[in-house]
Every structure is written in C-alpha cells, then in structure tokens.
Amino acid sequence: MVVRYPMAVGLNKGHKVTKNVSKPKHSRRRGRLTKHAKFARDLIREVCGFAPYERRAMELLKVSKDKRALKFIKKRVGTHIRAKRKREELSNTLAAMRKAAAKKE
C-alpha cells in the first residue's frame, strides 16, 4: 500500500484513504488440501498400504539411492515435480517408520 501525501499533483495526489483489504478469491484455493480430503487419503493409505512401485522406491531410498529412486518414480508418475514430491513423501514415511521403531525399542 502506497502512503498518499497531501499534494495536488503526482501519483500520490488526492485525499488520504485507507485501502479496503479484500478477501482472496475462492478460485485461489484450488489444490489446497482440506481436512476431509486429508482424512480420506490417510484412511486409504492405512487400509491399502503402498503400491508396488512405491515399495520399490522406498527400498532404493533405504540404501541411499536417492537419484535412482527419483528416476524410477519419474518413469512411473510422469513428471519431474510430481516425482520429487512423491520421493519426499516416501522419505518422510521412512523417517517416521524409523522413528517409530526407535521409540518401540
């Protein structure tokens, strides 16, 4: 927001006013995860587990073959960005599993 000065000429001419801050458009929330969608995905993950390609990628991540895992996932899911997101998700899952195993012992 630009501070308006009481000048008769220039870009900031005119009466000082406070700008109305409008709410962001509803169309801007496309792609944001809702509570219900997160719950549904977590439930499905709990019931179904991981797909075979995800299990193989997790095995590659376990032996520190991150780049190979990325190439493998990219071949399966299609795009580089989706593959990076999937690799991150699987590595977070592995870390959580390691943490749970350490807590158990």
Curated annotation (Swiss-Prot):
As for subcellular location, the record says: Cytoplasm, Cytosol; Cytoplasm
GO function term, MF aspect, one? structural constituent of ribosome
Cite the Gene3D superfamilies for this sequence: 60S ribosomal protein L36 (1.10.10.1760)
Q: Tell me which Pfam families the record gives.
A: Ribosomal_L36e
Keywords (alphabetical) are: Cytoplasm, Ribonucleoprotein, Ribosomal protein
Q: Which InterPro entries does the entry link to? A: Ribosomal_eL36, Ribosomal_eL36_sf
Q: Where is the signal peptide?
A: none
An annotated GO cellular component? cytosolic large ribosomal subunit
Query: What biological processes does GO assign it?
Result: brain development; cytoplasmic translation; regulation of cell cycle
Broad class of the protein's primary localization: cytoplasm
Record note on quaternary structure: Component of the large ribosomal subunit.
Q: What family does this chain come from, according to its entry?
A: Belongs to the eukaryotic ribosomal protein eL36 family.
What is this protein's function?
Component of the large ribosomal subunit. The ribosome is a large ribonucleoprotein complex responsible for the synthesis of proteins in the cell.
Name of the protein described by the UniProt record: Large ribosomal subunit protein eL36
- Recite the lineage of the species: Eukaryota, Metazoa, Chordata, Craniata, Vertebrata
